[in-house]
Structures are given as structure tokens and as C-alpha cells.
Amino acid sequence: MKITISGTGYVGLSNGILIAQHHEVVALDIVPTKVEMLNQKKSPIVDKEIEEYLATKQLNFRATTDKYDAYRDGTYVIIATPTDYDPKTNYFNTSSVESVIRDVVDINPNAVMVIKSTIPVGFTNLLKERLGIDNIFFSPEFLREGRALYDNLHPSRIVIGERSERAGRFAALLQEGAVKKDIPTLFTDSTEAEAIKLFANTYLALRVAYFNELDSYAESLGLNSRQIIEGVCLDPRIGNHYNNPSFGYGGYCLPKDTKQLLANYASVPNNIIGAIVDANRTRKDFIADSILARKPKVVGVYRLIMKSGSDNFRASSIQGIMKRIKAKGVPVIIYEPVMVEDEFFHSRVVRDLTAFKNEADIIISNRMTSELADVADKVYTRGLFGSD
């Protein structure tokens, strides 16, 4: 069975490598350098398991820039292209997904298309009506950037947005490649599957925002935030997870998914969803004000990446802090090894860590790290538990 993956980011690659253990997989991408790396068994993204599997496992996997080669004769086409949130329209930009669908319909109209990209609630059914097609359904992904393949090898659940034989066969592909057995698998309608994805991520954002507000309260009143969080989380109904204070929720998924869900609530009474989005802005204001209260001459930003083990800093929360500090006229320098540019938003990138430490009189870091241990007195962080 030939499976095509359109898009070789975290979602596309992790699904492709998972399935390529047992089936032919062809990955399509428009970036020639990424395709070349993949065909040399090298990962274009930082992900321990993806790197390991490409280098050491027997995979029936190749990549191409040729859409005709990729889509021809494929049984399933997994669509994993980016859907950025457009603040002007209050809607995901689904143009890349729609472009793939048009190409597949033109080249291989019998292929079953599976959307893995995050999309608005109701999008799949709207597409079916608009294009007059039925060979498509949505299946959300639940993964962490930097651990994408691990999360597909050990999934918490599989959700398939269709009840049919072809949906069952697709679920079997994911189950077959996983290390974990007896995976909870849920078959729903596509619209319900779309809602599951957005509500799951919005709940995670809610939890981040909750513990951040607890931490803001503790810092404002001079209380020990760690003791409070530990005491609260010993209640098994709350649990000791996803509770580490931060500069706000960030990254590619949570900010855009919460805003999209809020937009989907346009005609539905709500309070909590809007409050989550507002709380994240308030947290960034609070953090920036706390840093500025120390009257720094130069603020050093240690790492722009969203989390450890990732090379991605799309919409990382520390960027919001950085912009607020710069808006008050305080110079900002950046230490970020994965950057090739010399500037980021008009702030200088310092490549030498020692020089960076010497030049900054306050260093802000979303998480404490051993690299900063020798200048701990300069470091401002709200991370308490050494985890993302």
C-alpha cells in the first residue's frame, strides 16, 4: 500500500515514518533541501526519534518535490501542511490544505485524503459540499514538537473523523506502527473530530494560564509559588502535571488554536474561552513589568525556542516579553544557537555565550538551564520544576 504525506514538518514526518515501518511512504515537500536531506536519511527538524528512525530503521520511505510522483497510485494522502491563524479574518489560513486537495483530486481522484493539519470546526464538511467530494476525512494529531514521533509511537489516543471501512483501515495503519498496544481509538464525525482537537489544546492552554495566574499572585505577594502549586497538585483530581509556570503559553499550536476556537464561538455565549486568550496577554504584561521594575540597562534573551529539544521558535512566549521590553526603550540582545541571522526583530544576536552573559545585566529564560548556572543571580525565570 502506498501512502503519501504532503508536508514534512513535525506532523507529516512523524506520521510518515510511523507508517513507513510497514508500508511504502512518499513524502512531498516544496523545499528541495528538505527533500534532499530526507533522502539522505537526515531529519530537517530536531526530533530525537525521527533522527534515530531515519538513520537506523529499515523504512520504505522516500521524499520528492514532484506532486505527480507523490500522489499517483497512492491509497491514502495524509495532508499535514501548515494552517497559520490569520488575525484579520479570525480564521485559520487553510489555503495550503485546499491546494493539496485540488491537486489530489486532479491527479488521483480515488485516493482517500486524511487531513492532519489543524482546521476550523466544520471545515471538512464545508469542503465536501463545495468541491462535491466524499473521499476525505479529518484525523487530529496530539503531539509535542521535538517529541512528535515518540508521541505517535506511544499515542494517548487515536481519533478518526469518520465511521467507515476506509477509516478503520487508516486507524489500523497508525496502530500497526505504534509501540504502544491497545490504543484507545475513537471514530467520530469529522466535525466532532475537529472540535476534539481545538478543545483539547484549549484545555491545555487553560491549565497553563491557570498556573501562570497562580504564580503571578504568589510573586506579587511575596509567596512561595512552588509550595502552593505542590500543595494544590497533590489533589489527584488536579494532578502533578502541566503545572510549571512560564512566560505564557506559546509555540505553533496553542495560541492559534485558542483564537480559532474563540472565533468559532462567535454566536455562542462564552466566558472561559475568551478569558484564556486574555489571560495569556496579561501574563506577558506582568512578566515584562516585573523585568522592567529591575531597571535593566541591557536585557539578554536566552533562547527563543519554544521548549527544550526543539529547534522551533514560532510564536514562542518569550518573544512577546521581548517585544514589550523593547517597546519601553530597553536594549535587548539574544542568544539563540539555531539562528543563522545576525538580528531578530532589530535585536542583535550574540553567538558567544560568555559575551552574552557579560553584556546583559538581566538574562530572561523561560526555563532555567545548567548553561546559566554561573550567572544565576542575573537570571529571571518563572520555571520551577525543570520541565516544559
Curated annotation (Swiss-Prot):
Record Gene3D superfamilies: N-(1-d-carboxylethyl)-l-norvaline Dehydrogenase, domain 2, NAD(P)-binding Rossmann-like Domain
Entry binding sites for NAD(+): 2-19, 29, 34, 83, 118, 145, 252, 256, 314
The enzyme's E.C. designation: 1.1.1.22
MF annotations from Gene Ontology: NAD binding; UDP-glucose 6-dehydrogenase activity
Binding annotation for substrate: E141, F142, L143, R144, E145, K197, N201, Y242, N243, N244, P245, S246, G250, K307
Protein name, entry field: UDP-glucose 6-dehydrogenase
Superkingdom per UniProt: Bacteria
Catalytic residues (positions): C253 (nucleophile)
Class of this enzyme: oxidoreductase
Known pathway: Nucleotide-sugar biosynthesis; UDP-alpha-D-glucuronate biosynthesis; UDP-alpha-D-glucuronate from UDP-alpha-D-glucose: step 1/1; Bacterial outer membrane biogenesis; lipopolysaccharide biosynthesis
UniProt catalytic activity: UDP-alpha-D-glucose + 2 NAD(+) + H2O = UDP-alpha-D-glucuronate + 2 NADH + 3 H(+)
Keyword annotations from UniProtKB, A to Z: NAD, Oxidoreductase, Phosphoprotein
Family classification: Belongs to the UDP-glucose/GDP-mannose dehydrogenase family.
Post-translational modification: Phosphorylated on a tyrosine residue. It results in a significant increase of the dehydrogenase activity.
GO BP terms, alphabetized: lipopolysaccharide biosynthetic process; UDP-glucuronate biosynthetic process
Pfam families documented for this protein: UDPG_MGDP_dh (PF00984), UDPG_MGDP_dh_C (PF03720), UDPG_MGDP_dh_N (PF03721)
Keyword Magnesium: no
PANTHER family found in the cross-reference section: UDP-GLUCOSE 6-DEHYDROGENASE (PTHR43750:SF2), UDP-GLUCOSE 6-DEHYDROGENASE TUAD (PTHR43750)
Coiled coil region boundaries: none
SMART domains documented for this protein: UDPG_MGDP_dh_C (SM00984)
InterPro entries per the UniProt record, alphabetical: 6-PGluconate_DH-like_C_sf, 6PGD_dom2, NAD(P)-bd_dom_sf, UDP-Glc/GDP-Man, UDP-Glc/GDP-Man_DH_C, UDP-Glc/GDP-Man_DH_C_sf, UDP-Glc/GDP-Man_DH_dimer, UDP-Glc/GDP-Man_DH_N
